[in-house]
Amino acid sequence: MQPHHPKVLIVDDDPVHLEIYGLLMKQAGYEALLTLAKFSGAEIPKNEYIGLVLLDFRLNSVKTAPQYAQEIRSLYPSVPIIVLSDLWALPADIAPFVSGFVRKGEPAKLLETVSRFFAAPAAKSEKSPSFS
């Protein structure tokens, strides 16, 4: 059974950014699932109904954002991944794995982008396969 509110997975190495983006998503009516990408890495949740992923590009973690994007893509093949960054454009090394790019510090643009992906006809939450 899918959740009532679309679920957004947020991956960032900064706990403050996680809380800010989580609050922003909750205020917009989405359920936020926060994942801290620590230096030692982050455990991407499995067996969750994920509708969209927000992924920070500059991570102080053992894995890079493109590596996390590949992992997320393998778990949730059709779920959109939006990169968040203070860079001016989407970096080429992550482009093949993601669906969009939003500069940090633009909450209205972020909400517009998230809303657009959830409004798309093919948009649905996807649950990763069970791992035993």
Locate the predicted segments by residue.
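Acidic, metal-coordinating helix/loop segments flanking the phosphotransfer/catalytic sites
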Residues: 9, 33-52
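Conserved phosphotransfer cores of two-component systems
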Residues: 46-48, 71-78
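Conserved phosphotransfer microenvironments
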Residues: 54-71
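As written
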Residues: 93-102, 106
